[in-house]
């Protein structure tokens, strides 16, 4: 699942450098991998993991300079201070925090905010709601990021047309909308066939970034003095008010850093780290320092420095390559949104969603129509509403900084509860990360009126939806449980007054195997019959991403008529009840689909003043329940073998 293979690797046998030292620290506990497999995984990581942070140079340095300018004037110390801040931010946040620490906090090979939440909740007794709330906030912020990334990325690339052909400026927004609508429209076809070129295109993009930056560093080689943290510290202290605003813009250079952890399960830690240390990080630095040197020698170039430093003969190819890179970055975010949505459904944070598999060979290739539609609409609305990437920049940082802040808080619990670090060892590290995270978060939160409201608004709506679903399902479970009859009592009553026995097997789905399922009660009440064999089936989602087939099913014979079956799936796995029940043959149950009927209860919910939730939340929960995907489709049960029994419940 982690995408890692065992073997030997000679690619790291180079002279001792900062990269090799960091890599050695990151992989101190891992064996070597096959060289060819490693190259393939590194190339794949370039196409999926680094699209977002890799396209940041298009707009990040420009926005930071605009924030740093005093009355529209930039001093040499301002330019050196900004590029120094970018260098040290990338070093401390991405290279130190994520590479050396966060990537180690995997949940059975999987990463991402919900995986981290599940890992922490499993480690803490009682599975506290506080951690669940933190995870929900992190997931909501991720979706906010997923809305803004395609909008700002593609829009910033298309703004290159303003340099190539100024007369095409009015077409920047329409062209961006066309590209994004096309991108979201083709999602249902799957990306398996075209994804193979994502890696090579992004590799070419990073080469172009590095080459263009290196070329212009020679315009003013003294720009390399900004590697000294003195320039960053001086910039922060000379004019704190200006520096504080600038820090918020500097953070744009790190948007996408959370993808290193989110995509951990797709490639494994080693390919992600090697791609960063040996390709992405050096090329990003070369480009940022190249932009700084170009502006130092061409003071008027601060409007769109990324494209202005490209030679005229290479402008069109660069605009096209930038557009391709931003589309790939957007695709990676969209795919990530599908993955997080599926995890949220499995962890019961969101209602069931229709999930379509777009590839027979690649299990991870999924398409969620409802997520795609809502995400696409939100992205297009943002582009039409903000019109310029500089306007969207204010909205971008809040979601990502918030997500990083949540990650740091959960990382502390992992360090102390799972890695068993002493508080005296973990706390100084976490406090250092928190200081940096809080600085970036506070510098971005002040931009609420400039566009940050969009990010906060999206996250707030999603938090309300997810918390309402969690709270509503708990209230519903407690209410129905009070009305249910213990299975022991029903079996005892049937022993005294046996119902009519009919041939075949009946499978009753329930969330509580100790209580008689509602469908069973209604079947006995209205039809007065009991099947020859009855299975009380419970589907459980584990706190880990994957559960092996050998551990999928547990059987226990209750009596001659009843059997209890529990199916366990990881939160990254799509439940397939039919296939899972087939595994029960090895455990002694001769499962035959042709003689089996599945009984499901479909609840009709009505709001109640005694639900324990506000009326508006009752109505929202009922709406979410009505829009939930059908259980038959979600659990992949043959429709011809399903009997649904309706019940009305007041919540």
UniProtKB/Swiss-Prot annotation:
Superkingdom? Bacteria
Q: Which GO terms describe its molecular function?
A: potassium ion transmembrane transporter activity; symporter activity
Q: What membrane topology does the annotation report for this chain?
A: Multi-pass membrane protein
Where it mainly occurs, coarsely classed, is membrane
Pfam families recorded: K_trans (PF02705), K_trans_C (PF22776)
Q: Which residues cross the membrane?
A: 41-61, 82-102, 130-150, 163-183, 194-214, 235-255, 276-296, 309-329, 366-386, 395-415, 426-446, 450-470
Its localization reads:
Cell inner membrane
Query: What keyword terms does UniProt attach to this protein?
Result: Cell inner membrane, Cell membrane, Ion transport, Membrane, Potassium, Potassium transport, Symport, Transmembrane, Transmembrane helix, Transport
The name under which this protein is listed is Probable potassium transport system protein Kup
Q: What is the organism of origin for this protein? A: Brucella suis (strain ATCC 23445 / NCTC 10510)
Q: According to the entry, what is the taxonomic lineage of the organism?
A: Bacteria, Pseudomonadati, Pseudomonadota, Alphaproteobacteria, Hyphomicrobiales
């Amino acid at each position: 699942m982690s995408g890692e293979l065992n073997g030997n690797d000679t690619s790291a046998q180079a002279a001792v450098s900062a990269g090799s030292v960091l890599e050695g620290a990151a992989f101190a506990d891992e064996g070597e991998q096959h060289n060819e497999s490693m190259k393939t995984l590194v190339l794949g990581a370039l196409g999926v993991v680094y699209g977002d942070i890799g396209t940041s140079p298009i707009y990040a340095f420009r926005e930071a300079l605009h924030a740093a300018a005093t009355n529209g004037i930039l001093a040499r110390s301002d330019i050196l201070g900004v590029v120094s801040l970018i260098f040290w931010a990338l070093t401390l946040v991405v290279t130190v925090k994520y590479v050396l620490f966060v990537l180690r906090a995997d949940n059975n090979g999987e990463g991402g905010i919900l995986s981290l939440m599940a890992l922490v909740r499993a480690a803490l007794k009682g599975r506290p709601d506080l951690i669940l709330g933190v995870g929900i906030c992190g997931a909501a912020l991720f979706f906010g990021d997923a809305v803004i990334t395609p909008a700002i990325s593609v829009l910033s690339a298309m703004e290159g047309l303003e340099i190539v052909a100024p007369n095409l400026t009015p077409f920047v927004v329409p062209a961006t909308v066309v590209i994004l609508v096309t991108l979201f429209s083709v999602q249902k076809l799957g990306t398996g066939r075209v994804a193979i070129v994502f890696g090579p295109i992004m590799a070419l993009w990073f080469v172009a970034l590095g080459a263009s930056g290196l070329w212009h560093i020679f315009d003013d080689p003294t720009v390399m003095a900004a590697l000294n943290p003195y320039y960053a510290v001086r910039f922060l202290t000379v004019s704190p008010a200006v520096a504080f605003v600038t820090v918020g813009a500097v953070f744009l250079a790190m948007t996408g850093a959370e993808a290193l952890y989110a995509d951990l399960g797709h490639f494994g830690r080693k390919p992600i780290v090697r791609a960063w240390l040996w390709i992405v990080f050096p090329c990003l630095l070369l480009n940022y320092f190249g932009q700084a040197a170009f502006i130092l020698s061409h003071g008027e170039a601060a409007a769109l420095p990324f494209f202005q430093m490209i030679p005229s003969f290479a402008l069109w190819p660069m605009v096209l390559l930038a557009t391709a890179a931003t589309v790939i970055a957007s695709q990676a975010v969209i795919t990530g949104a599908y993955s997080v949505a599926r995890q949220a459904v499995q962890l019961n944070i969101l209602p069931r969603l229709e999930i379509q598999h777009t590839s027979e060979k690649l299990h991870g290739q999924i398409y969620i129509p409802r997520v795609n539609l809502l995400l696409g609409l939100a992205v297009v609305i943002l582009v039409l509403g903000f019109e310029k990437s500089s306007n969207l920049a204010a909205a971008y940082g809040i979601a990502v900084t918030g997500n990083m802040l949540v990650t740091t808080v959960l990382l502390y619990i992992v360090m102390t509860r799972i890695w068993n670090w002493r508080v005296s060892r973990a706390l100084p590290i976490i406090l250092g990360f928190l200081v940096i995270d809080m600085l970036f978060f506070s510098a971005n939160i002040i931009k609420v009126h400039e566009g940050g409201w969009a990010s906060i608004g999206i996250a707030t709506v999603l938090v309300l939806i997810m918390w309402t679903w969690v709270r509503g399902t708990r209230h519903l479970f407690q209410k129905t449980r009070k009305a249910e009859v213990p299975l022991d009592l029903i079996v005892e009553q049937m022993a005294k007054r046996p119902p009519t026995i009919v041939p075949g097997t009946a499978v009753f789905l329930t969330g509580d195997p100790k209580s008689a399922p509602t469908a069973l009660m209604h079947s006995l009440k209205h039809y007065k019959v009991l099947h020859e064999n009855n299975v009380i089936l419970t589907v459980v989602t584990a706190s880990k991403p994957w559960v092996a087939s050998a551990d999928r099913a547990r059987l226990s014979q209750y009596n001659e008529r009843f059997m209890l079956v529990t199916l366990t799936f990881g939160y990254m796995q799509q439940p397939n009840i039919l296939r899972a029940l087939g595994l029960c043959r090895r455990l002694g149950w001769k499962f035959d689909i042709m003689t089996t009927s599945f009984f499901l209860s479909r609840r009709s919910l009505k709001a109640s003043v005694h639900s324990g939730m506000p009326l508006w939340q009752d109505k929202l929960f009922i709406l979410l329940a009505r829009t939930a995907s059908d259980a038959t489709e979600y659990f992949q049960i043959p429709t011809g073998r399903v009997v649904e029994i309706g019940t009305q419940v007041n919540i």
